[in-house]
Amino acid sequence: MAVPKKKTSKSKRNMRRSHLALGKINVIVDSHTGEYKLPHHISLVDGTYNNRQVVTKKIDTEEVA
């Protein structure tokens, strides 16, 4: 069974793990709705992407009546 020859210091261990940190999420403000959204994603509020209507919302008949 393989075992380490010498103890790895906290500094060496943390330097090895330095690239594992998560980066910040880039969030932008939607120009139409003013809501926050991820870049290059469809707006969840009105279903637009790049100033075009991509997704239309389903209207429930129970809500209208």
Swiss-Prot record:
Q: Which family does it belong to?
A: Belongs to the bacterial ribosomal protein bL32 family.
- Kindly provide the name given to this protein in its UniProt entry: Large ribosomal subunit protein bL32
Its domain of life reads: Bacteria
Q: Name one GO molecular function term.
A: structural constituent of ribosome
| Keywords, sorted A to Z | Ribonucleoprotein, Ribosomal protein
Species of provenance? Rickettsia prowazekii (strain Madrid E)
A single GO cellular-component term from the record reads: large ribosomal subunit
Q: What HAMAP family does the record point to?
A: Ribosomal_bL32
Question: Any one Gene Ontology biological process term?
Answer: translation
UniProt cross-references to InterPro entries, sorted A to Z? Ribosomal_bL32, Ribosomal_bL32_bact, Ribosomal_zn-bd
Gene3D superfamilies referenced in this protein's UniProt entry, alphabetically = Single helix bin (1.20.5.640)
**Mind telling me which Pfam families this protein's record contains?**
Ribosomal_L32p
